[in-house]
C-alpha cells in the first residue's frame, strides 16, 4: 500500500454538499489579522483561488495563506481518521482538493486576458469571458447558494461580501473586466 492510498481524501465539493455550509476548521492559520476566526467559506475561497492560479502572479497573492490553511485542514482530517497527524508536504504532492479540477468549466491555462468576477452569481459573466479565452483571477458573491453552484461549475469558491475589508484585501488589484447585474434596473 502506497502513501497515496493511506491519505485521507479531502473533497471540497463533499464538504459543501448540504443545502448550506455549516462547517468551520479551526487551526493556527484560520485566524484573521484581528484575531477573529476566518469563516470556512473564506478559507475555501483562498484555497480554491490559489489552486486555480498556482504558478502565476495571481496565485502568489494567495499562496502563503492557502498553503497554511491546507496544512491545517489536512492535519485535522488525517488526525481524525487515523488518530495521528500525517506529513502535509507529502500529501500536497498527491493533489489535495483534486475535485476542484473535476468541474464542467475549467479555467484556461494560457489565457488571452484575465478578469475578475464581482457579483458573480452562478457564473454567467465568467462563462462568457472564458469562452472568449479569458481567465478569472478573483471572484466574489455573497449568496451561499450561488457560491455553492459556482464551486460546482468552476471549482472555485467566490469570496464573500466585497464591502468587507477581508474580502477587499484578498483582491489582486488587477482589473481587466467587471460586470454588475443590471436586471433590477432594466
Model-derived features with residue positions:
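Conserved active-site and SAM-binding loop architecture
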Residues: 1-186
Amino acid at each position: 500500500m502506497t502513501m497515496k492510498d493511506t491519505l485521507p481524501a479531502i473533497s471540497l465539493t463533499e464538504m459543501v454538499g448540504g443545502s448550506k455550509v455549516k462547517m468551520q476548521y479551526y487551526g493556527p492559520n484560520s485566524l484573521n489579522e484581528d484575531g477573529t476566526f476566518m469563516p470556512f467559506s473564506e478559507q475555501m475561497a483562498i484555497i480554491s483561488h490559489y489552486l486555480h492560479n498556482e504558478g502565476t502572479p495571481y496565485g502568489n497573492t494567495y499562496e502563503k495563506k492557502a498553503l497554511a490553511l491546507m496544512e491545517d485542514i489536512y492535519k485535522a482530517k488525517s488526525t481524525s481518521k487515523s488518530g495521528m497527524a500525517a506529513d502535509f508536504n507529502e500529501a500536497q504532492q498527491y493533489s489535495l482538493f483534486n475535485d476542484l479540477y473535476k468541474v464542467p468549466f475549467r479555467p484556461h491555462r494560457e489565457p488571452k486576458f484575465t478578469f475578475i468576477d464581482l457579483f458573480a452569481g452562478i457564473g454567467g459573466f465568467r462563462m462568457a469571458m472564458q469562452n472568449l479565452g479569458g481567465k478569472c483571477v478573483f471572484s466574489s458573491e455573497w449568496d451561499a447558494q450561488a457560491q455553492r453552484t459556482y464551486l460546482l461549475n468552476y471549482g472555485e469558491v467566490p469570496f464573500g461580501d466585497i464591502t468587507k475589508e477581508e474580502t477587499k484585501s484578498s483582491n489582486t488589484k488587477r482589473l481587466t473586466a467587471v460586470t454588475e447585474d443590471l436586471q433590477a434596473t432594466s
